[in-house]
């Protein structure tokens, strides 16, 4: 099998990733301009990205009596200061606006007898959100002058003189190679799962917290193109219901369940209640012989059993099925909990592209929004929508004010070269290893040497140096891999993306000489927090090597622009 068909497309805006941020950006651009848009989606926008299975709450909302600065303060505290104040505030100021827009599009938001949204805690409101992604996708599909290309896997940016010109990719169903030339590009490809050995083995390995199909393509393309990245060392580890990997927040907030050890002792007060502290406390209780750990649901009101079962059917039905299979309701037994493997995801932590206040990266004309954008944790659904909107608004303004020449007399030659690369991997050559075996080897290395589950999320510099050496060896070996069809070709590039991210992540973990976030970055060489590290750890690939850049914190009242940026 080989790629024989080629297509070159010229457009105003290319959106890579038709998930939460990507779809909302398209809606905003078309509302504010007549720009031509192409959305390149690896799956199908109807059920792609983090919202594919739906959600039962909007977790980032300014409820009555609160203001945007309150949300900024919450996110800053959870991340222990390492956030971009400008990004958090501009996001928080628009959370309610995008929520209202989603309701207008058809999202069902629960209301009380007074017609007010039903709050769940200080920052959340309840929704019936099983169909939230189809609602977004349907709105996009109705837009004029927007071409959605489903099953198109983007593999590389086209960058000249540090300015984005478009991207290359291939279609996984018909095998067409694409070169899409664009005046502006928005990367909205989500975060990175599958770097570490997961909770569940074999067939169930994709029973995980984050979509296994989000493999960090946007990060990897940016790294290889020389974009600056930030805070990868703030990994995200979710505290989940054991085995089902279902959310714990639904129980903790819905019925006020506390974290308890096997002795029935509440331990969350001992370690703290930030996201990383909850994971760390659970890990420590198990290590010190007081596990397993649970969310205490025994004794809750019977009507709450039905509420919890219904809530999980909207988002994680396996948890409801587990209760039914065991023949015990939540009120009759506590729910066992565990931490997941680490992920890189800018919607929960501050990891991702280093962007200016308008969400433009250090590559001119390339924007990032949602999980792929760094500096702004605790985005959740609405934060991703806002970032898509903010990036879109700046894109619209720049399209008005600037002139562009995206054509290149070498377009066909460049696409020919990319097709040769694809077909070299699609060749019939025998490989000693399969792509899946190489992926498992990568996950084993990261698990053992870079702070995975088996090492209790802990690492030291010697281990990280070994991880770097072994990942580099795997990168060399991956050059011998082959793919028998277009689907396997996608798997090859997903592996390539993850290996690229692993190297950058290792450098970030090495660079921060402190332990600011337990479990997220548990550095045994530097087990204490230090004010000397109240700064951003950024990286940039320069001439094939990853360079560490330390930057000072940015506050809410600053409008950050990239300085001394080579063009």
Give, region by region, the residue ranges found by the protein language model.
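Core beta-strand elements of the Rossmann-like FAD/NAD(P) dinucleotide-binding domain
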Residues: 8-11, 174-184, 362
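Glycine-rich active-site loop/strand segments that organize a redox cofactor
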Residues: 59-91
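N-terminal Rossmann-like FAD-binding beta1-loop-alpha1 element of flavoenzymes
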Residues: 13-39
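Glycine-rich loop(s) and the adjacent beta-strand/alpha-helix scaffold that form part
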Residues: 187-246, 381-394
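Glycine-rich FAD pyrophosphate-binding loop
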Residues: 31-53
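Mobile, glycine/GP-rich and aromatic-enriched active-site lid/loop segments adjacent to catalytic centers
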Residues: 104-155, 231-380, 385, 448-567
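Helical element adjacent to the flavin cofactor pocket in flavoenzyme catalytic cores
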Residues: 129-156, 160-179, 219, 225
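Long, amphipathic alpha-helical stalk/connector segments used for oligomerization, subunit docking
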Residues: 400-484
């Amino acid at each position: 099998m080989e790629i024989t068909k080629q297509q070159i497309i010229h457009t105003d805006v290319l959106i890579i990733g038709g998930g939460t941020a990507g779809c909302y950006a398209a809606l905003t651009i078309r509302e504010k301009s007549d720009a031509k848009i192409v959305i390149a989606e690896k799956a199908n926008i109807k059920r792609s990205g983090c919202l594919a299975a739906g959600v039962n709450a909007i977790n980032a909302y300014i409820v009555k009596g609160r203001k945007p600065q309150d949300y900024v303060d919450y996110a800053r505290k959870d991340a222990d200061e390492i956030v971009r104040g400008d990004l958090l505030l501009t996001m928080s100021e628009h959370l309610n606006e995008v929520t209202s827009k989603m309701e207008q599009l058809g999202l069902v938001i629960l209301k009380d007898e007074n017609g007010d949204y039903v709050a769940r805690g200080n920052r959340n409101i309840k929704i019936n959100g099983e169909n939230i992604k189809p609602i977004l996708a349907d709105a996009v599909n109705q837009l004029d002058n927007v071409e959605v290309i489903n099953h198109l896997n983007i593999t590389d940016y086209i960058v000249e003189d540090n300015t984005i010109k478009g991207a290359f990719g291939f279609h996984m169903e018909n095998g067409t190679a694409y070169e899409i030339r664009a005046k502006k590009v928005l990367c909205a490809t989500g975060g990175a799962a599958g770097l570490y050995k997961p909770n569940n083995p074999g067939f169930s390995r994709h029973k995980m917290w984050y979509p296994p199909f989000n493999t960090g393509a946007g990060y990897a393309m940016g790294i290889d193109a020389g974009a600056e990245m930030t805070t990868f060392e703030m990994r995200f580890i979710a505290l989940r219901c054991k085995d089902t990997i279902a959310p714990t927040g639904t129980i903790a907030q819905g019925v006020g369940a506390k974290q308890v050890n096997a002795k029935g002792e509440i331990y969350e007060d001992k370690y703290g209640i930030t996201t990383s502290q909850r994971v760390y406390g659970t890990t420590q209780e198990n290590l010190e012989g007081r596990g397993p750990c649970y969310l205490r649901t025994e004794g809750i009101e019977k009507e709450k059993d039905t509420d919890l079962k219904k809530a999980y059917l909207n988002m994680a039905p396996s948890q409801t099925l587990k209760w039914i299979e065991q023949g015990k309701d939540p009120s009759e037994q506590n729910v066992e909990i565990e931490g997941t493997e680490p992920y890189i995801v800018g919607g929960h932590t501050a990891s991702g592209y280093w962007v200016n206040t308008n969400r433009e990266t250090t590559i001119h004309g390339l924007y990032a929004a949602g999980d792929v954008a760094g500096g702004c944790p605790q985005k959740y659904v609405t934060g991703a929508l806002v970032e898509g909107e903010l990036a879109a608004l700046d894109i619209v303004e720049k399209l008005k004010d600037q002139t562009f020449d995206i054509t290149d007399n070498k377009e066909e030659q460049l696409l020919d070269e990319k097709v040769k690369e694809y077909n070299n991997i699609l060749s019939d050559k025998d490989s000693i290893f399969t792509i899946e075996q190489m992926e498992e080897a990568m996950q084993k290395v990261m698990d053992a040497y870079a702070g995975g589950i088996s090492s209790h999320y802990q690492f030291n510099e010697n281990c990280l140096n070994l991880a770097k050496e072994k990942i580099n060896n795997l990168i060399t070996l991956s050059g011998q891999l082959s793919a028998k069809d277009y689907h396997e070709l996608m798997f090859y590039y997903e592996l390539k993306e993850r290996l690229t991210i692993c190297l950058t992540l290792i450098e970030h973990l090495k660079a921060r000489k402190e332990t600011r976030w337990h479990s997220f970055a548990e550095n045994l060489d530097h087990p204490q927090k230090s004010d000397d590290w109240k700064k951003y750890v950024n990286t940039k690939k320069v001439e094939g090597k990853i360079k560490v850049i330390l930057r000072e914190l940015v506050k809410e009242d600053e409008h950050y622009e990239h300085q001394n940026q080579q063009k």
